[in-house]
Amino acid sequence: GKDKALEYFDKLSENILSYTSSGSGPINALIMKEAAIGLGMTPQAVTKINEGQTELKIKYFEEGSPYCLYGQSIISGKENRAAVKEVFSFLSGKLTEENTEKFCPEKIYKTKTFDVPNYPAEIKYADMSGDTLQAKEAFLEKWKY
């Protein structure tokens, strides 16, 4: 259960260089040979591989890769302001398309397909159906790293 998982992390932490708050930290630690394993983000690893860091290898947990969902919203009552419309249009249009084209080529558009060299073609994603805000807050109350 959850307590056993936390006990596991207590033992594992003896061999952890650091728990980073940045997504690039684990990848940079690998490149600088400060770590043998880094839990990082796929697009950052792919970017470094494409820049010539060919010793990096992308592996996923047997249970699947964790994932994040992103979205944009506008505060109610602000949606008619010209500047808000302009920024929102950029975020949900051009920026999302450029990000998908350059870093995260997974299929999100019906009519567009992007290809990023060395980006894994088939990523198995983990079942994160119980990953709620309440579950995260409860976990963070016990997390000491």
Language model features with spans:
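Short helix-loop capping/hinge motifs at secondary-structure junctions, enriched
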Residues: G1-K4, G77-V84
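Ligand-binding pocket segment of bilobal, Venus flytrap-like solute-binding proteins
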Residues: G1-K59
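Solvent-exposed, polar/charged alpha-helical surfaces in well-ordered, non-transmembrane soluble domains
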Residues: E7-D10, N28, M32, A82-K85, ...
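Short beta-strand->loop
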Residues: T54-P66, I75-K78
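Active-site lining segments that contact anionic ligands and/or coordinate catalytic metals
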Residues: E55, L69, K85-V87
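A bilobed periplasmic-binding-protein/Venus flytrap-type ligand-binding module shared by bacterial periplasmic
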Residues: C68-N80, N99-K102
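Periplasmic-binding protein-like
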Residues: F90-T113
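Extracellular/periplasmic bilobal clamshell ligand-binding domains
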Residues: F114-Y145
